[in-house]
Amino acid sequence: MSHEKVKELQVSALENGTVIDHITFGSVLFVIKILNLENVEDPIYFGANLKSVKYGKKGLIKVSNRYFRPDEINKIALVSPSATLIEIKDFEIVKKSRVEIPDDVKDIVKCFNPKCITNVEDVPTRFHVIDKVNLKLKCHYCEKITSKNIMEFR
């Protein structure tokens, strides 16, 4: 009996759904959380600290039977601007696109200013992205700047 080493473990291909690839190193679990994927019934496969020629290390999430809305794609872009979305139907790639940080972010991020109208009244948040490289958002109402390290999602 020969003892062959397993060189690669395969995860089932998606019949239908979305692959989020090239997730920023260390962000996979956060992406799962902000997309509320821990509460879906269909299978989800994810990998963290995967080797990447382009990025060194990356993360990957495969979500069965799910395609993301624009507001969800914006959340992914804010957390992982290098991410790629791959939509699968009948085991075939039907669409592949990179996420992009939008110019305006609506009702996704909380304003950290406790006196902002969005924290006092039932007003949806709205931010203007003033720096896409370092990710800085300016509140439309109180004009406070929110940076990536203090950003909270709604």
Question: Could you describe each region identified by the protein language model?
Answer:
Residues 2-97:
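Interaction interfaces in information-processing and related assembly proteins
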Residues 92-154:
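Cys/His-clustered metal-coordination modules, chiefly Zn-binding fingers
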